[in-house]
A protein has these predicted regions:
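Rossmann-like S-adenosyl-L-methionine
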Residues: 1-203
């Protein structure tokens, strides 16, 4: 319930402006988030032709950066981005963020990521790049199984819990992927927490 004001805040990230509502996930360290997202986009190796999925997309931050391209490197972007998150208010923000930033090659759906991926796999859809940033508990078998069925050429997995990330990466490696790069980012200085990015390629 909003007692006063618009019910959201505005922040700028990677040259884009984002609206964040109270129930929407958003990284709290903006400086390091730019480092995190820049590295993730670099790992995706976009050329302007790819269809990318932004799973667990929140307010659409990394998906919209992927759709637009990083400042100074706008040619390295996805042709199309599909975002999914189970928080309806976050998806509302993501759609507004796309509109506000003039991004027309990104669509967002409010649905459980695992169910959505499963549906895409059963419909015979295909992906070139999967960007995933699940909660601390990691992903689940339904999502990972569907991801392997969709067989994107590259998966960029961002995680705030290296333990559950390692578990999920092991599943992906056992099902046709090769771990090519690991890059930690210190999002929370002077704590034992770290954000970690893994890049995987289809063998």
């Amino acid at each position: 319930k909003t007692l006063y004001g618009p019910g959201f805040i505005i922040d700028e990230l990677c040259g884009l402006t984002f609206r964040i509502s109270s129930h929407s996930f958003y990284q709290v360290n903006a400086t390091q988030t730019e480092v995190l997202y820049r590295k993730a986009i670099e790992m995706a190796h976009f050329t302007g032709t790819e269809t990318a999925m932004d799973a667990y997309c929140g307010t659409g931050t990394i998906g919209l950066v992927a759709a637009k391209g990083l400042p100074g490197a706008e040619t390295a972007h996805a042709a199309r981005v599909i975002g999914v998150d189970n928080v309806a208010s976050a998806i509302k923000d993501a759609r507004e963020n796309a509109r506000h930033n003039g991004i027309e090659n990104a669509d967002f759906t409010a649905e459980d990521a695992g169910h959505f991926m499963d549906k895409l796999a059963k419909e015979g859809e295909s992906l070139d790049v999967l960007l995933m940033d699940p909660p601390r508990a990691g992903s689940n078998e339904q999502f990972l199984r569907s991801a392997c069925s969709l067989a994107p050429k590259r998966i960029v997995y961002i995680s705030c819990n290296p333990n559950t990330q390692a578990r999920d990466v092991e599943y992906l490696v056992k099902n046709g992927y090769r771990l090519t790069e690991v890059h930690p980012v210190d999002m929370f200085p002077h704590t034992n927490h770290v954000e970690n990015i893994c890049a995987l390629e289809l063998q």
